[in-house]
């Protein structure tokens, strides 16, 4: 529940979904709580291309920051954009979250070696 969390100046979303899911329904639930959208293409035949996902968001009055080829790329861009107290949320599919977790793990490995 994003609304119940402590204050953050901005909420950045790393977002990717599969074509057989209710994209509009998911977006409707969170659109007032996200300030910037970083949209990612998901792999496989069920993955929605980032451009198509951005059009669905635009139909709901949401401006997408940029489209990316993968959740990891979207996350890295969100990290560059985010301020010190901002939060980044990854959602839409387990594939989105897995891609972001992989990028976080890669960051940690680079910083510890």
Q: What positions do the PLM features span?
A:
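Active-site catalytic pocket residues across diverse enzymes, especially alpha/beta-hydrolases
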Residues: 2, 6, 57, 82, ...
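C-terminal helical cap/extension that packs against the catalytic core
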Residues: 24-87
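S-adenosylmethionine-dependent methyltransferases
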Residues: 111-113
């Amino acid at each position: 529940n994003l609304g119940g969390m402590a204050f953050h100046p901005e909420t950045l979303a790393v977002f990717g979904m599969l074509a057989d899911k209710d994209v509009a329904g998911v977006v409707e639930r969170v659109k007032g709580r996200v300030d910037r959208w970083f949209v990612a293409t998901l792999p496989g035949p069920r993955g929605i291309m980032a451009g198509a996902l951005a059009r669905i968001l635009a139909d709901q009055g949401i401006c997408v920051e940029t489209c990316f080829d993968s959740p990891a790329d979207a996350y890295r861009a969100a990290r560059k954009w985010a301020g010190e107290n901002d939060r980044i949320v990854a959602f839409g599919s387990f594939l989105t979250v897995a891609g972001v977790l992989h990028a976080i793990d890669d960051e940690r490995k680079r910083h510890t070696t």
